[in-house]
A protein has these predicted regions:
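Conserved FAD/dinucleotide-binding core of flavoprotein oxidoreductases
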Residues: 11-65, 83-96, 108-111
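Conserved mid-domain beta->alpha element of the FAD-binding
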Residues: 67-133
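Surface-exposed beta-strand edges and their flanking turn/coil or helix-capping segments
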Residues: 33-35, 43-47, 72-74, 92-95, ...
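Tryptophan-centric aromatic hotspots in well-structured domains and transmembrane helices
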Residues: 17, 73, 77, 141, ...
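Short, low-complexity intrinsically disordered segments
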Residues: 15-17, 102, 150, 188
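Long, low-complexity C-terminal extensions of enzymes
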Residues: 107-244
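Central beta-strand plus flanking loop segment that forms part of the substrate or channel wall
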Residues: 1-3
Length: 244
């Protein structure tokens, strides 16, 4: 049977990006686009053209305005999930942010009247989580080398949050990517996007020079061998009805 790719593709388009999610019985596709740069009919035409004969249904339109609450906990109401905010789905943060909203709320559930200090702490935690997700999303766009449409030219000139600008410049100048413990996205995720988008470092961490000769090559060789052995033992992704 034909194997199913075990990953989702994100494909840059004229005014946004297209997702392609392999499912057991079909491929899920969608186009997240900026209505400031492309109208609905143009977006539908671009998506339909990319799918060709594989399209099975008329595209549905889901409009959204990204953002978050100024205060997630206000008096006796706490906003969770889509009531709290929504960021575009490039990194699928909605479920995780909903879980964080519940997880961080549980220790603060009051027996009586809410403690305003706890309310403030909760709001600060949730605001920080959304800001972290926002910065990581913006990273994908500002580091893109595309300049062929107005959308991508605007992305290159977007105002970056201070934390994002600092991290990009730190990596470019030193080769280091410092991510505080407990952040939404790990150091590996940040490095994968920056290096994948062509952000290069002028230097590398000094401790690479003090390692014994051949140590790094030996370590990377063993790591590659481990991955290759694991891959040999893994089964292909295939439709459930065709799996043996």
């Amino acid at each position: 049977p034909e194997s199913i790719p075990p990953y989702t593709r994100s494909i840059a388009k004229e005014a946004g990006w297209q997702w392609e999610i392999p499912l057991s019985h079909r491929n899920g596709n969608g186009y997240v686009f900026s209505s400031r740069h492309l109208d609905l009919d143009q977006a539908k035409a671009e998506l339909t053209k990319s799918l060709g004969d594989s399209i099975e249904a008329e595209p549905r339109v889901i409009r959204f305005k990204p953002g978050k609450r100024q205060r997630f906990w206000e008096k006796n109401c706490v906003a969770i999930g889509l009531a709290a905010g929504f960021l575009e789905p490039l990194e699928s943060t909605a479920i995780h942010l909903s879980q964080l909203g519940i997880f961080w709320l549980l220790p603060f559930l009051p027996n009586g009247r809410p403690c305003q200090e706890e309310v403030s702490v909760y709001n600060e935690q949730m605001t920080s989580a959304y800001e972290q997700a926002k910065s990581f999303l913006i990273l994908h766009y500002v580091t893109s080398e595309r300049r062929d449409t107005q959308f991508w030219r605007d992305c290159a000139n977007v105002e970056m949050p201070g934390m994002l600008r600092t991290r990009i410049e730190m990596f470019r100048q030193t080769g280091r990517c410092y991510i505080p413990e407990g952040e939404l996205f790990s150091q590996g995720s940040w490095l994968a996007v920056m290096m994948g988008q062509g952000v290069s470092a002028d230097q590398y961490p000094f401790f690479a020079d003090i390692a014994k000769e051949g140590l790094l090559e030996d370590y990377m060789g063993k790591l590659l061998q481990t991955y290759e052995q694991e891959l040999l033992q893994m089964k292909e992704h295939s439709p459930p009805q065709l799996s043996s």
